[in-house]
Amino acid sequence: MSNLGKVIQIIGPIIDIKFDSENLPDLFNALEINAGDRKVIAEVEQHIGDDTIRAIAMEDTEGLKRGMEALDTGKSVSVPVGKEVLGRLFNVLGKPIDGAGEFISEESYPIHRSAPSFEEQSVEPEIFETGIKVIDLLAPYQKGGKIGLFGGAGVGKTVLIQELINNIAKEHGGLSVFTGVGERTREGNDLYYEMKESGVLEKTALVFGQMNEPPGARMRVALTGLTMSEYFRDQGQDVLLFIDNIFRFTQAGSEVSALLGRIPSAVGYQPTLATEMGALQERITSTKNGSITSVQAVYVPADDLTDPAPATTFAHLDATTVLSRSITELGIYPAVDPLESSSRMLDPRIIGEEHYEVAIKVKNILERYRELQDIIAILGIDELSEEDKLVVGRARKIQRFLSQPFTVAEQFTGMQGKYVPIKETVRGFKEILEGKHDNIPESAFLFQGTIEDVLKKAQQMEI
């Protein structure tokens, strides 16, 4: 028998509904409120009193009024999973919003699920090869790890994300799920069409809950994307999960918390901040079947890294990739800052002695070059010692060799994209450090793949 309640109060996205005291819906159950020509889905958040629940709407509450009937579905919000979701664009409820026709999925998963148990998890640290030199060499990603992507507007976050999607699809046969959490609809729209043009859409599922949507949708959309990823992982796939932006997940939680009447914590955030973040992040992990590797764009409010939202996120990250405007000004792409980016995987026991030594030497030489830049600016390069001149020469070559042509940017750059295996990356930088290529002009190193490509370019320049 259906369990019906009546709407008794509506305050923005918060709805109070009265049920029979014997049949109160469980927490996190989905409710359907019949608003005439449409059904509004809400999620139970609190039990208040003997016979009343407080729910948060996942959709706009326009048109709702007191006295309307609400049906308890008896389960939490469930979203479609499986191969059918690839190439499509969904909202928080798993409904397609791309206008590409009807969607039928054989299977669906609830968005609230437990994290894998300790027995199921894979504990062996394993490198996730991206084929992008600067990442693989200096701040390698962990399979099943969580990576924070930091960068302002227009420094290439989206292109880097697209290249990662392209590389995992073509080189590893893996799939990607992109989750837009509380970001601009225009950016989501641009991303969708750019993915379509660059040919990576067929290997990707997109889930959007943008900044014009109610806080309930923005708070739960990350779970929708994660649930789709978990299905692929359980089928033995390596999945890339992109969350743009993880700060908006916290921000939406803060709005909901205030609306539910909870006493705020530090800086006005929800008292359950660490718990909510943990519940999401703990589900992102490798199991013995497959892995979910997550790349999360992190907005830092007022550039304050001690703000509770980014500070809570940092506790979960295994690696950080920092994109820098000063590097884009040099015309070097991807504009990853080699000295600011870091990774827990940069450990000789995981990546091996050779890779570790080369990475540390590259960082040292770039650090020394940064120190010398002030002297060069004031006195000129001729005033440096012979040893420092050598350091500057090699550092400039390394800086340019850290650039790379991307497959997804081919139509804009006219250069064929390059995927570089880690072994080739390490070998190339080792040879530069050893001085084997001191006689090659630094311009030959810009936008090349392997060191062989550099040598070919140098030969062409001589001709």
Curated annotation (Swiss-Prot):
Transmembrane segment boundaries: none
An annotated GO cellular component: plasma membrane
Subcellular location, record wording: Cell membrane
SUPFAM superfamilies: C-terminal domain of alpha and beta subunits of F1 ATP synthase (SSF47917), N-terminal domain of alpha and beta subunits of F1 ATP synthase (SSF50615), P-loop containing nucleoside triphosphate hydrolases (SSF52540)
UniProt binding sites for ATP: 151-158
E.C. number: 7.1.2.2
Topology in the lipid bilayer: Peripheral membrane protein
Coiled-coil region list: none
One function term, GO molecular function aspect: ATP hydrolysis activity
InterPro entries: AAA+_ATPase, ATP-synt_VA_C, ATP_synth_F1_bsu, ATPase_a/bsu_AS, ATPase_alpha/beta_chains, ATPase_F1/V1/A1_a/bsu_N, ATPase_F1/V1/A1_a/bsu_N_sf, ATPase_F1/V1/A1_a/bsu_nucl-bd
Entry keywords, A to Z: ATP synthesis, ATP-binding, Cell membrane, CF(1), Hydrogen ion transport, Ion transport, Membrane, Nucleotide-binding, Translocase, Transport
Pfam families with a match to the protein in the record: ATP-synt_ab, ATP-synt_ab_N, ATP-synt_VA_C
Main location: membrane
Family of this protein: Belongs to the ATPase alpha/beta chains family.
Subunit note: F-type ATPases have 2 components, CF(1) - the catalytic core - and CF(0) - the membrane proton channel. CF(1) has five subunits: alpha(3), beta(3), gamma(1), delta(1), epsilon(1). CF(0) has three main subunits: a(1), b(2) and c(9-12). The alpha and beta chains form an alternating ring which encloses part of the gamma chain. CF(1) is attached to CF(0) by a central stalk formed by the gamma and epsilon chains, while a peripheral stalk is formed by the delta and b chains.
Function field: Produces ATP from ADP in the presence of a proton gradient across the membrane. The catalytic sites are hosted primarily by the beta subunits.
Protein name, as recorded: ATP synthase subunit beta
Native source organism of the sequence: Clostridium botulinum (strain Loch Maree / Type A3)
